[in-house]
Structures are given as C-alpha cells and as structure tokens.
C-alpha cells in the first residue's frame, strides 16, 4: 500500500489544468482506433503494396512539414487553448465524414486531413503543459500526460482490431466522439494558460527578439538531439509500419487482431512502468533516460526478426520495447523545455518534429522498396543498422550535454 501511495503521490500538487489535460488524453486515446491500423487498412482493405504505403506516408509527411512550422509559430504567438480547440473541431468533422461514407481513398484523405490539424495543435498542447508547470515539476506533468494517453490506449487497439474486418466505419465515428469529448473538457475546465513558476532554468528565459536559427546555432546540441529524434523516429515507426505488415504476412487478416493485442500490451506496460520509472529512477538525467530508452527500443523491435511465428516471444519483446519507450518519453519531453527559451518552445518542437518526420517517411519509403524486393529478414536488418546509428548518436548527446548546459548540472 505504501508503494501504491508513493506512485500516486508523486502526481499530487500539480496544477488543476494538468489534471484536466490528463483526463482529456485518456478520453482521446480511448477513441484512437484508426491510427494503429492505418497500415493494415491500406494493405488489406485498399490493396496497396509496402512500397506504395510508404510512398503515401512520405507524401503525407511532406505535406505536414509546413503545418508543423505553422503550428510552432502559432504556439509561440497565439492563444494555445484556442488553437487546440479549433484544430480538434476540424479533426472531429473529418472523422465523422470518413465514417459515414464507404471506405475508399477519400476516407483515408479525410483521416490525413484530420491528422494534419492534430499536427498543428501538437506544439500548442506540449507548450501548454510546459506553461502549466515549472522546471522542477515538468517531468511529472509530462509523465502524467503520457500515462493518460496510454490508459486510454489499453483497449482501443484491441477494439479497433475487432472492428477491422466488418465495422471499420464505426471505428472512425468512435474516434470522432472521443476527440469531441476531450475538446469539451478543455473548453469547460481550462481557464488558466500559464502559472507562476517557482523555478525557471536560466536557459528557459524569454528571448523574444532572437530567431529560431540563432537559437539553434547557439545551442548546437539541440540539433544533435533532433538527429537522435530523426533516427529514433524511423526505428520507432516500424512499430506501426513494418511490424503490422509482418503480422499480416504471417497471419492474414487475423494479423490485425494480433497487432491490436500487441498495441494493447504496449499501453498496459506503459501504465505499469511509467510511475515505477518516475518514482524510483526519476533522478536519472533526461539525456541518460533517452540513451537507455533508445537502446531498449532498438533491442525489442529489431529482435522481431528472429522470432517469426513464436507468439509468446512477441509479447516479451513488446515489453522490452515498451520499457524503452517509457524511458525515451520521460527523457525527451522535458529535455527541450529545460534548454530552450520559453518563447521558442513551439518552433523548436516543430523543427524537431520535421526532422523526425523526414527521417521516418523517407526511411519507410526505402524500407518498403527493400521489403518488396528482399523480404522481411533484410528489412529488419536495415532497421537494426539504423538502430546502431541511433544508439551512437544518443550516447554522443549524453556525453556532450554537460558541456553545453553546465548550469543544469550545477542545479542538481
């Protein structure tokens, strides 16, 4: 009981708005039925091959790049609550339309439009969490948001897998309803958009007149962080690209159900591991968490190459992968907000997201061609090689961070 109280107690005394955002994350994630199955929808329902799926993903990612820049600029210059609500309403409308029409390329286009507006609001959502916490409580605030997202995801992918064959239209409508419910929570209960901070890192001080380029030149380790994010995004993307394709090749349409179960296991392990890591390993620095997390992600995901048709091992590897995801997320979310002026959080977030999106989309196109020509074993090998590069970059970041931001280490 004492341990349970310790786990829950670490999330006490955060600002009320953080808890509202937490419940909003839960509700939204409960309706996230489409995105885990998107690759399988394109493959199984619409008949695209792996290369074409990767090309579609790359084109959509390229189209989102200017939206990321717009989202970052808006997050740094406009009311963040208004941005989130406006984008959510567009997302709801698109998902309702996609659910009401017969499944086709138009349905996918509507879903991608919805995802574009979700992309625009992303920097505002992340910056709002940072605005409502200070440097000391930020990791717990982000940890709570991450926990909420995965609480909602425990059943969503499994439900999506069950609806996949005959009731996919209903999955679109459930996604719309969940997003609308979350939006109403924000409209009604989010009143403050920032709080007085007890502790502000010197690196967070406002610098209104300084450009994004100047900040990146001045803090070059942030560019290295973006490269880690790029390689990491490509490797992590295989959870929703190569892995479901592999399941579909082994089990046919039933692969969607198996992948849905794996995704639910992912969410369940996050729920169990997040408070444990935050409570007992909270003193590990964010850059070290990144290194540990990326290493476990590479190990857990790449090992699927060696366990084809061994169902029990799928779930063991998913546990390893997910523990890595927890470390990575708890490291990367506070990283930038402690090292970047508050006036630039949105734009730097957009820059990192663009790098990540470019790596994952171009990488998936290459991987799709490799998969179509050489098969799954070679494709997984390519993921492993990229993973080695990722681990090296994450190690370099952890070693250079103290020199780049010495005051953060003096504060401990």
Positions of predicted regions on the chain:
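Structural signature of the two symmetry-related core transmembrane helices
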Residues: 82-96, 288-303
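Cytoplasmic helix-loop-helix junction between adjacent transmembrane helices
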Residues: 112-149
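Helix-to-loop junctions at the C-terminal end of transmembrane segments
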Residues: 67-79, 273-286, 371-372
């Amino acid at each position: 009981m004492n341990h349970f109280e310790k786990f829950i107690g670490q999330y006490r005394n955060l600002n009320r708005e953080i808890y509202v955002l937490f419940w909003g994350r839960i509700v939204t994630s409960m309706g996230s039925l489409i995105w885990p199955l998107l690759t399988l929808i394109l493959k199984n329902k619409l008949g695209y091959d792996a290369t074409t799926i990767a090309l579609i993903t790359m084109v959509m990612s390229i189209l989102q790049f200017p939206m990321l820049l717009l989202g970052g600029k808006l997050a740094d210059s406009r009311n963040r609550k208004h941005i989130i609500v406006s984008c959510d309403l567009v997302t709801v409308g698109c998902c309702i339309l996609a659910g009401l029409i017969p499944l086709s390329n138009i349905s996918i286009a509507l879903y991608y439009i919805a995802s574009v507006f979700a992309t625009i609001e992303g920097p505002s959502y992340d910056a709002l969490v940072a605005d409502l916490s200070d440097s000391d409580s930020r990791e717990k605030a982000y940890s709570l948001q991450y926990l909420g997202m995965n609480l909602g995801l425990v059943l969503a992918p499994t439900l999506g897998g069950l609806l996949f064959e005959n009731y996919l239209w209903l999955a679109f409508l459930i996604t719309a309803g969940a997003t609308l419910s979350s939006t109403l929570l924000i409209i009604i209960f989010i009143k403050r958009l920032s709080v007085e901070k007890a502790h502000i890192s010197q690196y967070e001080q406002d610098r209104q007149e300084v450009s994004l380029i100047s900040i990146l030149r001045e803090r070059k380790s942030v560019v290295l962080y973006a490269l880690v994010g790029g390689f990491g995004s490509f490797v992590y993307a295989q959870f929703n690209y190569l892995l479901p394709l592999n399941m579909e090749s082994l089990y046919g349409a039933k692969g969607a159900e198996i992948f849905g179960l794996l995704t639910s296991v992912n969410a369940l392990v996050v729920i169990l591991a997040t408070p444990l890591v935050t409570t007992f390993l909270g003193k590990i620095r964010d850059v070290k968490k990144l290194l540990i997390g990326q290493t476990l992600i590479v190990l857990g995901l790449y090992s699927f190459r060696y366990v084809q048709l061994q169902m029990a091992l799928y779930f063991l590897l998913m546990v390893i992968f997910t523990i890595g995801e927890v470390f990575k997320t708890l490291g990367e979310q506070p990283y930038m907000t402690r090292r970047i002026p508050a006036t630039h959080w949105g734009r730097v977030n957009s820059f990192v997201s663009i790098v990540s999106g470019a790596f994952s989309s171009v990488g998936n196109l290459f991987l799709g061609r490799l998969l179509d020509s050489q098969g799954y074993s070679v494709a997984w090998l390519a993921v492993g090689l990229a993973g080695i590069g990722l681990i090296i970059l994450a190690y370099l970041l952890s070693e250079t961070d103290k020199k780049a931001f010495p005051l953060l280490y003096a504060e401990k």
